[in-house]
Amino acid sequence: VPTRAVSSLPWRDVIVATGATDRVLPVPGWTLPGVYTLGGAQVALKYQGCAIGDAVVFAGTGPLLYLVACQYAKAGANVVAVLDTAPASARYKAAPAMLGQPAVMAKGLALVAWLKLHGIPMHHGVRLLCAEGNAAIEQLVWQDSAGREQRTACSAVGMGYALRPETQLADLLGCAFEFSALHRCHVPRIDAMRRSSVAGVYLAGDGAGIMGADAAEYSGELAALALLQDRQITVDADRLAALRQRLQKIERFRHALEVAFPFPDDWAAHAGDDLVVCRCENVTAGTLRQTAAECGVHELNRLKALCRVGMGRCQGRMCGAAAAEILAQAQSVPLAQVGRLRGQAPIKPLPLDVTEVIEPEDHHA
């Protein structure tokens, strides 16, 4: 929407590279000022040159947890603690498989070593209990691996449980989806060349599954080569084979990361009924459970229609994963069975003062 004008661009082929957003699992108090996603904390530092607080805790799990903590500490921020819900033993279990990508593994170990060398406390196997404070967060309450309750004073928290694919544009383009146990969500179905189920639509990067920056680059090139191939343009077969081989190695490493940083699949069972899951519409876990029980709901979009979860400004990007976990737990069904929140246009909010509609030119991109 440039200069308050709506325009459209005709296309014959399109490569969709929408990336990823944070996967968030709420805790009581997560709506307090000072509680951020890991990605939000990283954006504040990288693009605005500021920290989210003067005493920051990073919590959750996944490689991004340690990367952002390191970035903050190296920038001079006061990182109070790193709280990882994954047990330390998970790293040792995953280590043999992670050796398939020694350079990437070394980068991760270097982050942890740097934090340890600079005296930043790191705790593993924790459970986040709540964020407390009056006008803003003042402390994070958590349970250590021995089951003891701990309280860490802080002015800000960066929280996240790895990333989730941003798939709404692929959804609106009509792409077929399938459940991925690895990603714990539905992702667009693609072939080995990144073709979607829709002719002329190719998917690159984390928007089709979280694989990281290197894989995003390789998959983008692979999608471009597939597009050229489909236009009957000769491409380098050796390059195709090399790209696919690299992506296969990264995918094996990705499976190892899931072992090293497991999703806390008991989160929904511990989520209290008063926990706000959808902050846009102020929908609690109790409302989700009650609606599911009273109306016999087993599908996420039906739940959305009945209680407005995921209908707010974020269109479910913030609450969709958590709502799916709650529904599956409440109805004792597999996560794959509850489905996914369907994308709705407009994907992002539009200004009300749009003044002009620009008609598309008569050409194909």
Where are these regions (language model features)?
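Residues forming the flavin
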Residues: 1-307, 311-313, 317-326, 330-365
